[in-house]
Amino acid sequence: MLKPVSEWIKHSFQTVENVSSDSLEQLLKEDRDRVVLVDARSQAEYEVSHIEGAVRVDPDASNMDNVVQQLGLPDVQKENKTVVCYCTVGYHGSQMAQKLSGFLANGSGRHEVLPRVYNLEGGLVKWANERKEIVDGRNKPTALVHPYNQVWGQLLEPELRASF
């Protein structure tokens, strides 16, 4: 049931590149310092669980200069960074990736090497359903995910759904 949702999101954000959960997991194992993880969900969702090391950014943020500062991207001018945005299933992650990549491209004078910006395909739902590692707000391992709403909650394995 997640696949049609992911396809709809890809169709809605055709300029956004997606990275698979397996590719991100491998990249994190190989070179975690090169990856900037952006969690584009609410604080309540982030507190239930997130990918370790992710920086939570308000999904409705419109001031991308502030977002870039929050992520530490002004300090990576000569580094080859990969930015991966995610949310519950990929919609807000794709929105954030689109805004961020557009902002960085338009302000490219600041960066000698532009970071690659992706959306995590399937979002945290796919990541958790595959039993990949997530942590709670205290950085303790957890398996639970805030489902965002009842519809997206149906995409999570029942034992992974946090009550909200």
Regions found by a protein language model. Give the residues of each.
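Active-site-adjacent beta-strand anchor residues
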Residues: 39, 86, 120
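A generic secondary-structure signal marking the coil-to-beta-strand transition
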Residues: 34-36, 53
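Rhodanese-like catalytic fold shared by cysteine-dependent sulfurtransferases
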Residues: 1-22, 44-82, 94-164
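Gly/Ser/Thr-rich loops at beta-strand to alpha-helix junctions
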Residues: 88-94
